Amino acid sequence: MPRSQINGNFIDKTFSIVANILLRIIPTTSGEKEAFTYYRDGMSAQSEGNYAEALQNYYEAMRLEIDPYDRSYILYNIGLIHTSNGEHTKALEYYFRALERNPFLPQAFNNMAVICHYRGEQAIRQGDSEIAEAWFDQAAEYWKQAIALTPGNYIEAQNWLKITRRFE
């Protein structure tokens, strides 16, 4: 039984019902429908913290999905899982791959900035201020890109950029 049919969360059930209706009425190929089913099941597993299952579904969705825009969201969600698992290098790779396919994902830029900022803080704790500054500069660049895409969002990042004099 597909995960979407056993999910107990009301919002997930509602999403699944709407998604199934849309899949029936919007003209799509069977491959696209199957890719979306895996993507949907991946999101469901991810929301429940079942990251291994989510990754399996996302990888299968990637195998089937041909649209670069849709692939960008699959890659982004894989990046989220790696971030949650503390696998920051892998997460950065997947966010970057998502942005290659869809450069209008401010949340990917934001997450990349958060990882870089975190690494900057780690470098400070290790006493390496030069490396820390490099990480902070990279975080600033990613936050600037996120803010450029959605100027009203990322207020804390905007404040950090101003306080650290990295905002132009």
From Swiss-Prot:
A GO CC term assigned to this protein in UniProt: chloroplast thylakoid membrane
Protein name: Photosystem I assembly protein Ycf3
PANTHER family tied to this protein: CELLULOSE SYNTHASE OPERON PROTEIN C, TPR REPEAT-CONTAINING PROTEIN MJ0263
TPR repeat intervals: 35-68, 72-105, 120-153
UniProt key word Iron-sulfur: no
UniProt-listed NCBIfam families: PRK02603.1
Subcellular location: Plastid, Chloroplast thylakoid membrane
Protein task: Essential for the assembly of the photosystem I (PSI) complex. May act as a chaperone-like factor to guide the assembly of the PSI subunits.
Lineage of producing organism: Eukaryota, Viridiplantae, Streptophyta, Embryophyta, Tracheophyta
Keyword annotations: Chloroplast, Membrane, Photosynthesis, Plastid, Repeat, Thylakoid, TPR repeat
Membrane topology note: Peripheral membrane protein
Principal subcellular localisation of the protein: plastid
SUPFAM superfamilies per UniProt: TPR-like
GO biological process, any: photosynthesis
Similarity-based family: Belongs to the Ycf3 family.
